[in-house]
Amino acid sequence: MKIILLGAPGAGKGTQAQFMMNKFGIPQISTGDMFRAAIKEGTELGKQAKALMDEGKLVPDELTVALVKDRIAQPDCANGFLLDGFPRTIPQADALKDSGVKIDLVLEFDVADEVIVERMSGRRVHQPSGRTYHVVYNPPKVEGKDDVTGEDLIIRQDDKPETVLERLAIYHKQTKPLIAYYTAEAEAGNTRYERLDGTKPVEEVSAELAKILG
């Protein structure tokens, strides 16, 4: 099963990716992890990517697609994979298609912006341990304090409402067009497209996913 995950940051893709990895024994592939691995291993593509990144330049789509193709040709992807964070743009989706990679299923996690802002801006973190709380869904016993040590909890820069809104704006501009792209691909019979309501409880979303995946 070759799957693409679409959805804004905070839409719950990571949680459900974990569920699918365990169910099918397929790896989750994120471009960030791939770049780091290729650079660490000193592969030809890794060297090219590093040179560009060191200059503060964006890695071109062709290079990203080449890295993805390299990664999905590895033995652990024989039964499929989950692509998370790629493709991000229409040119990347086109390049992936042109390179001959057949995607079986595109899953969209649909969550309204205001829900995502509430989810992410409500997070509180105990930095030394990495323990995470949420003011609504998983509050600490004492407001603003870690349950174990009693130390202060912080709001990460990434979780501040203004940062979340910025990330959502980028998502809508760059990645939202992919929803129309893959809906059209599904209508043309080239893939299957399923939308999941990411506001439902985790277990419900997982149960729905299990049905879709058969």
From Swiss-Prot:
The record's region (NMP) falls at: 30-59
Q: Which GO terms describe its molecular function?
A: adenylate kinase activity; ATP binding
Listed A to Z, the keywords are:
ATP-binding, Cytoplasm, Kinase, Nucleotide biosynthesis, Nucleotide-binding, Transferase
What the entry lists under InterPro entries is as follows: Adenyl_kin_sub, Adenylat/UMP-CMP_kin, Adenylat_kinase_CS, Adenylate_kinase_lid-dom, P-loop_NTPase
Q: Which residues of the sequence carry a binding annotation for ATP?
A: 10-15, 123, 132-133, 200
A GO-annotated cellular component: cytoplasm
Sites binding AMP sit at 31, 36, 57-59, 85-88, 92, 156, 167
Q: Which CDD domains would you find in this protein's record?
A: ADK
UniProt pathway annotation: Purine metabolism; AMP biosynthesis via salvage pathway; AMP from ADP: step 1/1
Pfam families per the UniProt record, alphabetical: ADK (PF00406), ADK_lid (PF05191)
Free-text comment about domains: Consists of three domains, a large central CORE domain and two small peripheral domains, NMPbind and LID, which undergo movements during catalysis. The LID domain closes over the site of phosphoryl transfer upon ATP binding. Assembling and dissambling the active center during each catalytic cycle provides an effective means to prevent ATP hydrolysis.
Q: What does this protein do?
A: Catalyzes the reversible transfer of the terminal phosphate group between ATP and AMP. Plays an important role in cellular energy homeostasis and in adenine nucleotide metabolism.
Quote the subunit structure annotation: Monomer.
- What family is this protein classified in? Belongs to the adenylate kinase family.
| HAMAP family xref list | Adenylate_kinase_Adk
Q: What is this protein called?
A: Adenylate kinase
- The coding gene here is adk
